[in-house]
Each structure stands twice: as C-alpha cells, then as structure tokens.
Swiss-Prot record:
Database matches in PROSITE patterns: AMIDASES (PS00571)
Catalytic activity: L-glutamyl-tRNA(Gln) + L-glutamine + ATP + H2O = L-glutaminyl-tRNA(Gln) + L-glutamate + ADP + phosphate + H(+)
GO molecular function: ATP binding; glutaminyl-tRNA synthase (glutamine-hydrolyzing) activity
Cystines in this chain: none
Pfam family, one: Amidase
Record-linked InterPro entries: Amidase, Amidase_CS, Amidase_dom, AS_sf, GatA
Active-site positions on this chain: K79 (charge relay system), S159 (charge relay system), S183 (acyl-ester intermediate)
Species whose genome carries this gene: Sinorhizobium medicae (strain WSM419)
HAMAP family: GatA
Alphabetical UniProt keywords: ATP-binding, Ligase, Nucleotide-binding, Protein biosynthesis
Name of this protein: Glutamyl-tRNA(Gln) amidotransferase subunit A
GO cellular component terms given for this protein: glutamyl-tRNA(Gln) amidotransferase complex
Enzyme class: ligase
Length: 493
C-alpha cells in the first residue's frame, strides 16, 4: 500500500469514500510522520494527537452512515493565528503565553463542519510579521527543500512558513494560512506548494488574531491546485461576526479545474521587471507566458504605474494598523504578565518582554506614522497611494484583461540566519515586492510552482485576478501546473 501521507486531498477523499482506508489510519500516518520529522523541521508548535484521533473516529462513523462532509477525515494543520477553542493559540508570540481561546475561528469551524481533522497548530512568524519564519518565539522553521549538494538549512518563507513546510514535507494533507502582504504566496513559492490569497472578504477574519485588519485574509496552502480549490470552498463563507466578509455565493472552485483558458487575456505588467531581478526569474516568467499561450490564452502587455510605491506604502499602512491592533496585549487579562511597580510599569515590562524584535520594530513604525506630526505626511499619503494602486488594477481589468501573470518572489529560498538580511530589515521586506500590491488592492492572488532554479530549488509564478474571481485563477493555475509538473523535496530529515 502506498504511503498514506503521499495522497493528495482529492485522492484521500476518494479512498475514504470507497472505504479503502479509514480516517483513523490516515490520521495515524500523519501523526507518525510529524513525530519523526517535526524535531528537525519545526513546522508544528503544538500537536493534538488525542483531538485528531477523536475527530477521525467521528469521521469514520459519518462515512459509515453515509453522512460524509466535503472534507470528511482529511487531516489538516492550522496556522497558530487561528483561534482554536481550548487549544494553544499564541500567534507564535511570548506575549500570549498559555492563551487558549474560548472560541473557534469561523474558518476553522467551517473546516470542522465539513469533517476535517485537526493535527495541530503550525509555526509562523510572530503575529504574522516576517518573510522567513525566523521571528517566531518557537524558533525558525526549516524548509524541506535543500539546494543540490548542500546541507544548508533554508527558510520556508513567511509568515505562513509552518503551513508551507508542513504541506511540502507531507506532515498534513493541507493547511490554513493567512496573507497580509504575501504570507501565503511567498512561502508556497519557496516550498513548491500552491497557495491562494482569496479576495479580501471571501473568508471571515473572525477569530483570527489580527495583524493589519484591512489587509489580512485567510487562505489555504496545499500540494496542488485542486487541493487548494477543495480547501478554499470549505474555508470561505459570509459571516455576520465579520462585517468585512462579503455575502456572495461561494462557487464550486474544483469545477473550474480543467476548464479551457482559450481566448482568455493575460496581462503582463512591465513594472514587475525590477532592477537586479535574477535571470532565472525572468526566464520562469517567460516560460509561464509560453505555457499560457500554448493553452490558447492571449498575452497582452499592461502597465501598473504605481507598483513602485506599493512596498513603501504597505510598510506604512500595515505597521500603522498593527500598532493599533497590538495595543490590546498588556498582560492584564490573558497571556504573559511581568509585574511592575504600578500598572503602567507592568504594561511596559510585559510588552518589552513579550514582543519580539520585529514586532517591536513594526509597532514603533506604526505609532510613528500615526503620530500627530506625521499622520498626513505618511499614513494619509500611503492610503492615497493605495487607492491609486487599486485603480491601476481596475483599469487593467476594465480594458479586458482576465488575469495578470507575474513572478511570485524575486528569488528562491535563502538561508536561515542570513547575515545580509539580518543586518538590513529593508532587504528582508523586499521579498514582498511582487505580492503586496495584491493585498493593497484587495484582490485574489495564487502562487503555483513553475519550475526549479539552477540549485534545484522551487520557483513560483503568481496569478492575480479580478475581485471574487478565484475560479479564473484556479483554472489558469491548473494549466501552469499541468505544464510545469509537481515538485516534491528529496527527504533529508
């Protein structure tokens, strides 16, 4: 019998339905894989074996009774940003030590309602602030990929590094993730997995620990495009508890896979050809263009003139919202508390001890740009730039473009504790250069593996779609996936 952890969600669903395997067997296979690998990969920060087996048993009973849900018996990993009732939920921060919420996030509740099984909570950058999963209080995640003839540990990307690494290393069938400026798409590109950031409002943010509320959006990371479509169908919903969630029917995304893209117009934005971009990224982009052309799509050059302002504007808007959102962590009601001589001293000591360096940096930036003397010069101007970025996309789509193709990242995965990046945070921020525009405009974006670089590391392509048109992204990404093939790392752990 094949290793159960090698099954995609679609394959496992079929075998469970045909009663070739049981949910308990599948769950035990993943729990064994986690036990063997997690000490090395560090993808999970909390494993929930008892809960997983209990859920799997209930799934087997429902399958036996002919009442199987859409994800019945499928074992998933959950990013530590999602509130899971009575279970570890800390956003991988010291300040939330011991926090176990009394509520379940809407997205995870949707998954459990469809019969999914929870394996545990996944590592991530602290409060989702980072591009390499090195800011976690629980230590860095190791990318399951290594360069050819190298034993150097690489980052899996961030902030959803645990989600991407767990999917790539087959430590879960699929994972939840969140994306504020690229935190689903960049890790997916670094690990040879598929990640989709849906349109802002497609998935409820209720019960998800907030970073930047106008940018955050939940989505799945999966092994292939079909699995991502299956997961998003279950995750997405309107939610009266989240006023930013949109009351639109959730389509059957899986049905879009395999549909023809003949006659579709794919935009290629000239502004994404950034200075110093490696030749391999340009070659991958051209290869993506060729694949879509071969499938009958029409390629059109487009301009998104305000792209160059997206990164600086993002790094004003996101920290500003974060400084406000993170003001609630003060040691009074939950999490870490460091005693002080009075309440203000307690606040200061708790926050000094509880937040990591990158989180402190972003709170400081955010507080600065919101301060009386600088609000107009920074925050207000960044919001105006955001409107212009959104308008660029609207004009492109209005002119008849169906989707936009770009690289997902400016490079393949880099080393853990890279000295060059550690000494210059702005260099780390540049990892988001191709992804932040999508969040600023509230659009859907998907990262799909396009090939390997000369070191044998995965590179991803990104497709950007019209609001709430994730179906077009799935069918187009599937064309790229069919042409490029699927990529799995050689096991070294």
């Amino acid at each position: 019998m094949t290793d159960l952890t090698s099954l995609t969600i679609a394959e496992a669903r079929a075998k469970l339905s045909d009663k070739e395997i049981t949910a308990v067997e599948l769950t035990d296979a993943y729990l064994a894989a986690i036990e063997a690998a997690n000490e090395t990969i560090n993808a999970y920060i909390a494993v929930t074996p008892d809960k997983a087996r209990e859920m799997a048993k209930a799934s087997d009973a429902r399958i036996g009774a002919g009442k199987a849900g859409a994800l019945e018996g499928i074992p998933l990993g959950i990013k530590d940003l999602f509130g899971t009732q009575g279970l570890h939920t800390q956003a991988c921060s010291h300040i939330l030590d011991g926090f176990r919420p009394h509520y379940e996030s809407t997205v995870t509740q949707n998954l459990w309602n469809d019969g999914a099984v929870m394996l545990g909570k996944l590592n991530m950058d602290e409060f989702a602030m980072g591009s390499s999963n090195e800011t976690s209080y629980y230590g860095p995640v190791k990318n399951p990929w290594r360069a050819k003839e190298s034993n150097l540990d690489l980052v899996p990307g961030g902030s959803s590094g645990g989600s991407a690494a767990a999917v790539a290393a087959r430590l879960c069938a699929g994972a939840t993730a969140t994306d504020t400026g690229g935190s689903i798409r960049q890790p997916a590109a670094f690990t040879g997995t598929v990640g989709i950031k849906p349109t802002y409002g497609r998935c409820s943010r209720w019960g998800v620990i907030a970073f930047a509320s106008s940018l955050d959006q939940a989505g799945p990371i999966a092994r292939d495009v079909r699995d991502a479509a299956i997961l998003l169908k279950s995750m997405a919903s309107v939610d009266p508890k989240d006023t930013t969630s949109v009351d639109l029917p959730v389509p059957d995304y899986e049905a879009a896979i395999g549909q023809s893209i003949k006659g579709m117009r794919i935009g290629i934005p000239k502004e994404y050809r950034v200075e110093g971009m490696p030749e391999e990224i340009e070659a991958l982009w051209q290869q993506g263009v060729a694949w879509l052309k071969d499938a009958g799509a029409e390629i059109v050059d487009i301009s998104l003139p305000h792209t160059k302002y997206a990164l600086p504007a993002y790094y004003i808007v996101a920290p500003a919202e974060a400084s406000s959102n993170l003001a609630r962590y003060d040691g009074v009601r939950y999490g870490l508390r460091v005693d002080g001589k009075d309440i203000v001293d307690m606040y200061e000591k708790t926050r000094a001890a509880g937040f990591g360096q990158e989180v402190k940096r972003r709170i400081m930036i955010g507080t600065y740009v919101l301060s009386a003397g600088y609000y107009d010069a920074y925050y207000l101007r960044a919001q105006k730039v955001r409107t212009l970025i959104k308008r660029d996309f609207e004009l492109a789509f209005h002119a008849g473009v169906d989707a936009i193709l770009t690289p997902a990242t400016p490079s393949s995965a880099f080393g853990i504790a890279d000295e060059d990046l550690a000494s210059d945070p702005v260099k780390m921020y540049l990892n988001d250069i191709f992804t932040v525009t999508v969040n600023m405009a509230g659009l859907p974006g998907i990262a799909v593996p396009g090939g390997l670089d000369h070191k044998g590391l995965p590179l991803g392509l990104q497709l950007i779609g019209k609001p709430f048109d994730e179906e077009t992204l799935f069918k187009t990404a599937h064309v790229i996936e069919q042409a490029a093939g699927r990529f799995t790392p050689s096991k070294w752990w």
